[in-house]
Amino acid sequence: MAAERYNPRVAEAHWQKVWEENRTFETDNSDSREKYYVLEMFPYPSGRIHMGHVRNYAMGDVVARYKRAKGFNVLHPMGWDAFGMPAENAAMQNKVHPKEWTYQNIATMKRQLKSMGLSLDWSREFATCDVEYYHRQQMLFIDLYEKGLVTRKTSKVNWDPVDNTVLANEQVVDGRGWRSGALVEQRELTQWFFKITDFSEELLAGLDTLDQWPEKVRLMQRNWIGKSEGLQVRFALAAGTAPAGFSEVEVYTTRPDTLFGAAFVAISADHPLAKKLSEGNAALSSFIEECHQQGTSLAALETAEKKGFDTGIKVKHPFDDNWELPVYVANFVLMEYGTGAVFGCPAHDQRDLDFANKYKLKVTPVVLPKGEDAASFSIGETAYTDDGVMINSRFLDGMTPEAAFNEVASRLEKTDLVGRPQAVRKVQFRLRDWGISRQRYWGCPIPMIHCESCGVNPVPRADLPVKLPDDVEFDRPGNPLDRHATWRHVKCPKCGGDARRETDTMDTFVDSSWYYTRFTAPWENEPTDRKAADHWLPVDQYIGGIEHAILHLLYSRFFTRAMKVAGHVGVDEPFKGLFTQGMVVHETYKANGQWVSPADIRIEEIDGKRVATMLDSGAPVEIGSIEKMSKSKKNVVDPDDIIASYGADTARWFVLSDSPPERDVIWTEAGAEGAHRFVQRIWRLVAEAAPALKDVAPKAGTQGEALGVSKAVHKAVKAVGDDIEKLAFNRGVARLYELVNTLSGALQQAADGKADAEMKGALREATEMLVLMTAPMMPHLAEQCLAELGGKVAGKETLVARAPWPVFDPALVVENEIVLPVQINGKKRGDLTIARDADQASIQQAVLELDFVKAALNGGSPKKIIVVPQRIVNVVA
């Protein structure tokens, strides 16, 4: 009898209610089973989830459901990264309070996530804008302050002139603010900093322990931390060219071997010498001001045009008093890196070469590539940056650059310049302290108080939390806390006199740098419960986008170490395993030069070509490239629409199935329809066979077709489990497609009443196993199928969500037959399929029965037959 069509809308709502009523996914910290903590990067509540969220959270849910089935006590929580500028922008544009806007969005997105059937422990949910959360963050801030890991200092900062706030270096992308896209400026402000540089060496060394992280991410962090071993060299200023009080310029270099190729020295616009020279020099002052208009990050420096201002000052070459080099103020040198001064060797650094060509400075090659002739070798438009041998370098000629480095260092360390060595070896890091001050309202208040008499002091713990006031105005850019009539005024906790609150709030990356620790016991008064934190951390599997490789992941690694110093956690690394998933992408469409939504077009195949037209008018539509889903290009697919049309399981199945999870997946309507057909196919096969299998005890087949069914499903159990362990979800999906194809004929026989007792037992076991294997990907369908089969696994009543992962029989997984390649006179001519345990005589006899062997022997006998056990057979004719 044909089964009634599966209705995902009804089934999914039903099972989500069952899971919620049974509190199926709530985690007990006291559970004695081995723990497994799986976490997807929590979302910013921007308004609605998108298909990228669906893919990210579907992957995490597969892992969580699988690990539960494997017997682990799984922690799989969800929260909201809820502070940030978009809420303030919405407040200004829509006249709605950031709090109201944020919590409305959270409610919408929570409903959407719940509709996906994710196995989340919602009892641990929090938003970072909850007072209860940022209260504990303020406690942490004070703890780190007392441990000397927070400091306040004046520094050059990246200023976003649109968002009117400071940006960390990592938040400046190609010289622009990561949110606003505005060109970033430099300003000098007094800021609060986390001393991440105290952990530079630890953060670098720790990368070697993260063997379950993508190498690409580790490399990005290694480069960002930027450890370099170099030489700090003192260049004496040429007499008569320098202002009073200045006698030298100290330069940090990682290439002292190239000193004989030096063409100039460049100093930062903020170098004391530059500041002194700018006094009364309008042209230099103007140039310095121009330098301040660009960002302070290395990315900003790399993308900006390289410019310099010749100061007229000269320095003496460290190895030749008669050799003088010009000193430039340059826009590509930062005071905060090294010493704020560099020497330029144009032949072997592209930036220096571009600069030298622009200002017509001499280019002298000092490293000769292997195989080149020193007399004819020259530098064109591209600097030579590889290895070789030293030339044009006097006493260094013939050495390798490495040997030359050490020779230069050794000589200059022994050379006296005004009572000190002319050079010292030095280790530098590119990483700088993390400036966390933000001039905005919607963030965690920094719990510090400024008093004219007592200085800056923490808010007493008894007075925490420092709550954000609700009565603020967003009638203009800037920080409303600065303009609040009463909030900023407070009494000094030391002297009782008038004082003011810190009005800067914390960078929102602080909120996400420790949230994973809070999930371990979000009800505790302290930031963490040490026992719970030590039990659950590190996170076993973290899943999120590669775009967070530096910002969030590096800050989290710092924060774990800082929290360890403060006694809140016992681990160094927050995330044991990291997986960075690809994006969900979609074709783009244009009509009359305007972007068009896929929901508004029809695509047909005409004469072998895909043709798109507008649904309402039939007007032609241009099919464009496949790109990341974005509102601006209107190639967005709303998960609500997909779930309403096909169900959550179809959406989950499709985003898991179409490509390896680390690559982008192309969303197509045809792909979604194909996934939905598969959902319906599984349901039909199970539902139609269920009456025949419902009361049958599961039992593996021992012979014939029943044995074949059991072998197929047991092999799939092993393979799909291995695939999920490796996060190769698409391979697991492919195996399940294959298994359904294998089982379909036998299930149809059972539905038609044509299966014998042994086949029924094998099919009951196979169907249970199939249902349990699909459950991590399509949990609602799995529950509905098991209910149709009587709601039992191995004879026991259970929800699929609480059922164990099926156990394969090793005997059924091992092939009893093997395929041996057969060679004739050393050339492969065919294969022999034979029992795995066949002896040599049996193999030789079977080979002689093969038609292609008989033909080759032409009625004769072979000279010999060589059998390499389990590998190959060679017939010598």
Swiss-Prot record:
A motif ('HIGH' region) lies at residues 43-53. It comes from the Bacteria. A motif ('KMSKS' region) lies at residues 628-632. Keywords: Aminoacyl-tRNA synthetase, ATP-binding, Cytoplasm, Ligase, Nucleotide-binding, Protein biosynthesis. SUPFAM superfamilies: Anticodon-binding domain of a subclass of class I aminoacyl-tRNA synthetases, Nucleotidylyl transferase, ValRS/IleRS/LeuRS editing domain. Pfam families: Anticodon_1, tRNA-synt_1, tRNA-synt_1_2, tRNA-synt_1g. GO terms for cellular component: cytosol. It catalyses: tRNA(Leu) + L-leucine + ATP = L-leucyl-tRNA(Leu) + AMP + diphosphate. GO terms for molecular function: aminoacyl-tRNA deacylase activity; ATP binding; leucine-tRNA ligase activity. Gene3D superfamilies: 2.20.28.290, 3.10.20.590, HUPs (3.40.50.620), Isoleucyl-tRNA Synthetase, Domain 1 (1.10.730.10), Valyl/Leucyl/Isoleucyl-tRNA synthetase, editing domain (3.90.740.10). It is found in: Cytoplasm. InterPro entries: aa-tRNA-synth_I_CS, aa-tRNA-synth_Ia, Leu-tRNA-ligase, Leu_tRNA-synth_edit, M/V/L/I-tRNA-synth_anticd-bd, Methionyl/Leucyl_tRNA_Synth, Rossmann-like_a/b/a_fold, tRNAsynth_Ia_anticodon-bd. Its EC number is 6.1.1.4. It is an enzyme of class 6 (ligase). GO terms for biological process: leucyl-tRNA aminoacylation. CDD domains: Anticodon_Ia_Leu_BEm, LeuRS_core. ATP binds at residue 631. Belongs to the class-I aminoacyl-tRNA synthetase family. This is Leucine--tRNA ligase. It comes from Brucella abortus biovar 1 (strain 9-941).
